[in-house]
Amino acid sequence: MAGPLSGLRVVELAGIGPGPHAAMILGDLGADVVRIDRPSSVDGISRDAMLRNRRIVTADLKSDQGLELALKLIAKADVLIEGYRPGVTERLGLGPEECAKVNDRLIYARMTGWGQTGPRSQQAGHDINYISLNGILHAIGRGDERPVPPLNLVGDFGGGSMFLLVGILAALWERQSSGKGQVVDAAMVDGSSVLIQMMWAMRATGMWTDTRGANMLDGGAPYYDTYECADGRYVAVGAIEPQFYAAMLAGLGLDAAELPPQNDRARWPELRALLTEAFASHDRDHWGAVFANSDACVTPVLAFGEVHNEPHIIERNTFYEANGGWQPMPAPRFSRTASSQPRPPAATIDIEAVLTDWDG
């Protein structure tokens, strides 16, 4: 694969969620990713688009032969990604110490929800659980309603795979000077906590409260929210700065002199009611056209099925069509070492073929 990580060798122990997502991004950026799957888990691989840009092999890691083959592969790798509960790879004979014996330059990347240590480290959980303990889930939703799960973007991917990737790349950079590998302990509860650092800082200065839906960036401010249009669809409004707010009012045909002051919190309900009435007067596409070339920070809220028709998305080739559906292209983009369009998930190959290739 073309890309800035061309030549990097990655072994991925089969898992779900953020580990495979991190491996996918490494593959998108040119790394040679080999996924070791269980022999009984290969059904449905062609339907999992997250397994793009991989070579897939199978091995029974509980057998002596499977363990031996896996260690041979790891001995030639730069990075190992695993997402099991703490202690599982050690019991398999593939823990950090065992792998370091065959490859002391290996970056051993561990992805868990709770981390390798702590009282919850052996406890099951999902994205919603990890972000429930660090304040994030409590902060998302309307003030008069229960907290709303933000899909599984914040814990699994924002706080999980993204920070796993940061750890891998940082450890690879450090290896250039030390010549040694190390363990990367990436926990979703830790990474997602860093994502919300801005809110902690605002809270420390009195600019954020624990009351959900009452703050500037959580839908509390009427100029940072979504509004329903005449056709039942929605627009997103992010008109925070005065000049953007003024542009929004101009597009709506409203006079600031006749409205409550933008940042008078006591009159936010009144301002919200006026904006709600204005946006409800026309359909979403009308407002999309009105604000298409303005700095009002007003955009249509598109469903998945509409995204690939958005002119900006089309112009940037943000998505490509594959197997009857749409998939995102690799990101970010590089001026000299551009990534190519991803390969679809491949059929399994013999692990010996990869070993021979990596011997070259």
Swiss-Prot record:
Changing H126A: 4.5% of wild-type activity. InterPro entries: CoA-transferase_III, CoA-Trfase_fam_III, CoA-Trfase_III_dom3_sf, CoA-Trfase_III_dom_1_sf. It is an enzyme of class 5 (isomerase). Changing C297A: 6.2% of wild-type activity. Inactivated by N,N-dialkylcarbamoyl-CoA substrate-product analogs. Its EC number is 5.1.99.4. It comes from the Bacteria. It catalyses: a (2S)-2-methylacyl-CoA = a (2R)-2-methylacyl-CoA; (2S)-2-methyltetradecanoyl-CoA = (2R)-2-methyltetradecanoyl-CoA; (2R)-pristanoyl-CoA = (2S)-pristanoyl-CoA; (25S)-3-oxocholest-4-en-26-oyl-CoA = (25R)-3-oxocholest-4-en-26-oyl-CoA. The active site is at H126 (proton acceptor), D156 (proton donor). Changing M111P: 5.2% of wild-type activity. Homodimer. Interconversion is achieved via a planar enolate intermediate. Catalyzes the epimerization of (2R)- and (2S)-methylacyl-coenzyme A (CoA) thioesters. Accepts as substrates a wide range of alpha-methylacyl-CoAs, including (2R)-2-methylmyristoyl-CoA and (2S)-2-methylmyristoyl-CoA, (2R)-pristanoyl-CoA and (2S)-pristanoyl-CoA, and the cholesterol esters (25R)-3-oxo-cholest-4-en-26-oyl-CoA and (25S)-3-oxo-cholest-4-en-26-oyl-CoA. Can also catalyze the interconversion of the non-physiologic substrates (2R)-ibuprofenoyl-CoA and (2S)-ibuprofenoyl-CoA, which are potential competitive inhibitors of the enzyme. Belongs to the CoA-transferase III family. This is Alpha-methylacyl-CoA racemase. It comes from Mycobacterium tuberculosis (strain ATCC 25618 / H37Rv).
